[in-house]
Amino acid sequence: MEEADRILIHSLRQAGTAVPPDVQTLRAFTTELVVEAVVRCLRVINPAVGSGLSPLLPLAMSARFRLAMSLAQACMDLGYPLELGYQNFLYPSEPDLRDLLLFLAERLPTDASEDADQPAGDSAILLRAIGSQIRDQLALPWVPPHLRTPKLQHLQGSALQKPFHASRLVVPELSSRGEPREFQASPLLLPVPTQVPQPVGRVASLLEHHALQLCQQTGRDRPGDEDWVHRTSRLPPQEDTRAQRQRLQKQLTEHLRQSWGLLGAPIQARDLGELLQAWGAGAKTGAPKGSRFTHSEKFTFHLEPQAQATQVSDVPATSRRPEQVTWAAQEQELESLREQLEGVNRSIEEVEADMKTLGVSFVQAESECRHSKLSTAEREQALRLKSRAVELLPDGTANLAKLQLVVENSAQRVIHLAGQWEKHRVPLLAEYRHLRKLQDCRELESSRRLAEIQELHQSVRAAAEEARRKEEVYKQLMSELETLPRDVSRLAYTQRILEIVGNIRKQKEEITKILSDTKELQKEINSLSGKLDRTFAVTDELVFKDAKKDDAVRKAYKYLAALHENCSQLIQTIEDTGTIMREVRDLEEQIETELGKKTLSNLEKIREDYRALRQENAGLLGRVREA
């Protein structure tokens, strides 16, 4: 057992347990060393469970009992077959400790128990855990973010990205320079924000449309590209998008190259009113007569023709001004445009408030109109009834008799219809009950089959999950096998195992030989006992016949009887001696077993722990009294 203990201690050292060099057997293990060995093994086997356990034995007795119970529960969760409690850790015995450590050593991973080149300790465990995580991530194939499952998103990560979804925008185009843009659009054309229902796609659609307009403008400015827009508009949507993208890439490169030149003449600012009209062209385009808001907008933002001519004539002069004057003019123009935009926004807010007020008034008027129509219809119905009654008043008696006759006919007709309905209702009710019963049976059968199908689906899912888990374990084991060094020599362990097996075989042969010799000896004893009994019986019979005639024969008979009695006592004494020797050997084995369990030392430890526990309780009671 010492050789087995040394192999087990070597495995514990590989798992990270700091076993002193002078400890060669499990009999020398202390309580602190037992707790540390079990915790280190649990951390290697299941880091999630072992990370919450401390390898150091606490000083307080209550904390010791809690730690021992936690270790026992963790080992039982791993599948330890024998009974386990706190006493197995605080007061360990050699056989129980050997069984427990062998159980844990068998469940140690391969790299923790056989790879002797790896360092031991917490850092080694951390490095091995990091390596296993990296191997798992490298073993998984790369998947695009939109196709990742939640597990892959957890492993590989997935940022919250929004795809670029652009929609085709329909805006009015200028067919002639002199005609305003709002009169060229269709009355049914919606505003640009309304054409894109998703808020996420509005910015993308505007960017794409702006880039397309820029590319079209650049294409118009270049000679030979005037019909490019008409050519792309006649293409299918996919080819149109592809052609626009290629055209855009070429034109943007040239546009950016030209934009980084020297600052030239500032581009003439577009009329803000025209810009707002182009933005909201779909709202009111078919009105031949402008509203008050339109007139105020034109009055506020429309430039005078003379000012426009002056601005156009001043463009060459402005281009010759210094750069600072140009920037100042641009800033001033930008400030004026901002002020105009704020005024327009305020006007829009006022108009929206008026529209909301008018909308509320319109809803109230509609509700009042509906109520008036309902009350009018009710009054008309009552008026018709009263007018009919007034018409019947001149000949009241005859009309009353006619009405009575009509009522009686109606009652008879109702009774007749009730009888007919009863005739039809009885078979229909019976058929309904029959069909309801069949429906209930079908529902029960359907529910039963549905339950069977659900159970079958669950079993299929469980089998698929189990197969997937086993496949992952197989791949992990194969990857670990590939990473293991090929030059690991197990010759010493194999040779030692073969020697142990040979010794066991020799011991078995010796035990078999001893058992066979014992059986032969038992047979010989039995045969000699039977032969002795038969010889004594014959001799007793012969001597007893002659004992009546001769005194010497009588004395010989007495001596024979005494000899037989003494031999019987001697045999009984020998048997008792053998029984006692067997009991002595059993007691010696029990003594060795009890000595191996360290009963006396455990009792002494229990007494010390009991005294420490009483001291702790006394201290706690003193604190309670003081509080």
Curated annotation (Swiss-Prot):
It is found in: Endosome; Cytoplasm, Cytoskeleton, Microtubule organizing center, Centrosome. GO terms for cellular component: centrosome; cytosol; endosome; nucleoplasm. This is Coiled-coil domain-containing protein 22. It holds the Pfam family CCDC22_N. The gene is CCDC22. GO terms for molecular function: cullin family protein binding. One of its GO terms (biological process) is intracellular copper ion homeostasis. Belongs to the CCDC22 family. Component of the commander complex that is essential for endosomal recycling of transmembrane cargos; the Commander complex is composed of composed of the CCC subcomplex and the retriever subcomplex. Component of the CCC complex, which is involved in the regulation of endosomal recycling of surface proteins, including integrins, signaling receptor and channels. Involved in regulation of NF-kappa-B signaling. (Microbial infection) The CCC complex, in collaboration with the heterotrimeric retriever complex, mediates the exit of human papillomavirus to the cell surface. It is linked to Ritscher-Schinzel syndrome 2: A form of Ritscher-Schinzel syndrome, a developmental malformation syndrome characterized by cerebellar brain malformations, congenital heart defects, and craniofacial abnormalities. RTSC2 is an X-linked recessive form characterized by intellectual disability associated with posterior fossa defects, cardiac malformations, and minor abnormalities of the face and distal extremities. Its main location: other. Keywords: Coiled coil, Cytoplasm, Cytoskeleton, Disease variant, Endosome, Intellectual disability, Phosphoprotein, Protein transport, Transport, Ubl conjugation pathway. Residues 320-627 form a coiled coil. The modification Phosphoserine is found at S410.
